[in-house]
């Protein structure tokens, strides 16, 4: 699915979470958070792509900030904070859905990466003229230092913990 993007972290905290979408312009090489032309001229890309629809009180007024709505896979939100995954509300956000949003074939041909949805990642990277959108942000992540064994009354010393094929010593290595 190419409307789902991993942050490579787990247990994402909403506190201090920031996400922005940037576009690398051809003309001057400057990354911008908005289009410079068309009906979406000046509109933040985070809003264009449906990741900012509400303010922080959940009123339907975009505020330029990512809408941190957890449990995306079950309630239609924007993030799965436990898995560290961002969900765009469109199936093909950088392809046909953006094409519909722009409502201009010439601009759509310029900005849309339609073939992204039929190519592998390595193939898509071969099109630098189309591969110009970037996700940028910051987050805090935490994960527990304990692993649940889902068992009770486990005798001391009966658990083997390994890292890289080497048995670790309880009380020394962990």
Give the ranges of each region predicted by the language model.
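Surface-exposed, low-hydrophobicity segments enriched in Gly/Pro/acidic/Ser residues
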Residues: 1-174
């Amino acid at each position: 699915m190419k409307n789902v993007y991993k942050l490579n972290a787990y247990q994402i905290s909403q506190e201090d979470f920031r996400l922005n979408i940037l576009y690398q312009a051809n003309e001057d090489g400057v990354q911008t958070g908005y289009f410079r032309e068309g009906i979406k001229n000046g509109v933040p890309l985070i809003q264009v792509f449906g990741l900012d629809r509400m303010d922080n009180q959940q009123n339907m007024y975009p505020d330029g900030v990512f809408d941190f709505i957890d449990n995306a896979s079950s309630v239609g939100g924007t993030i799965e904070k436990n898995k560290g995954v961002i969900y765009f509300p469109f199936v093909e956000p950088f392809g046909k859905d953006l094409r519909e949003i722009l409502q201009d074939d010439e601009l759509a041909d310029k900005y849309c990466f339609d073939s992204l949805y039929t190519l592998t990642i390595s193939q898509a990277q071969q099109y630098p003229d189309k591969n110009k959108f970037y996700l940028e942000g910051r987050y805090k992540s935490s994960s527990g230092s304990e692993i649940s064994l889902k068992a009770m009354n486990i005798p001391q010393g009966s658990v083997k913990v390994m890292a890289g094929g080497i048995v670790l010593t309880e009380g020394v290595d962990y």
